[in-house]
Amino acid sequence: AEVERQKVKRLAIDTLSSPEGKEALDYLKLKRGFSVNVIDNFGLGYVPSHVNNLYGDPHEFAGRIVLPIHDPYGELVALSSRDWRKNAYSKFFHEQYIKSNYLYALDIAKDHIIKSNQAIIVEGEFDVMKMHSIGIRRAVGMLGSSLSIKQISLLSRYCQEIFLVFDGDEAGRTSMERAMKLNVKYGLKQYYDILIIPVAMPNNLDPDDF
C-alpha cells in the first residue's frame, strides 16, 4: 500500500504541471490564489481521469486534486483528495487513516511553531495553505470536524500557545465549543502546559476567504 501511495503521489505531482493537469492547476492558482511555490511545498497534484486501479476499475483519485498527508517527520501517511467541479458527486475523498492522530502540514509548520512558541489550528487543508501563502507559516489543519486530545498533545511538544481559528458558520462554532470543552476536561494548561485561545471569525467566513 505504501509503494502504491507513493506512486500515486508522484503521478499526481507530475501530471499537475502537464497539459492534462492545466484545469486543476488553474483552479489552484486562479480560484484559490496559491502560488507555484505553495503548491510545490504542499505537494499538491492531480490524478488523470483515465487512470485505473490494480483491478482495472477507475482509480478512486481519478480526476481529483490530491493532497498528501504526512506525519510530523514528513512520512507519507495517507492521500486526501478534492473534486473542485461544481457538480461533483463527492467533493472530498481520502484514504482510511486515523485523522485524529495527525495535523495537516505539521511537518511543514513545525519549525515555525517551535520558533514562535505558538500554533494556529484551522479547519480545512486549503485554509492552512492560505495562511502559509500570506506568511503565517505556523498554521496547521485539524483533518476532521473536531479537535482531539491526541492532536493537542502532539502540538504540546512544539509550543505552549494554540490559537483556534475555525470557520464562522454553525459547524465552525460547534467545533470551537467542542475544542474548548477539551480545555476544561483535560486541564490543558495544568497538565500539558498549553494555553488554548479561541479566535472568532465573522459569520459564514473561513480563513480561506481572506
Regions found by a protein language model. Give the residues of each.
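Conserved phosphate-handling catalytic cores of large alpha/beta enzymes
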Residues: 156, 162-210
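Non-catalytic accessory segments of DNA primases and related replication-initiation nucleases
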Residues: 1-53, 64, 76, 91-92
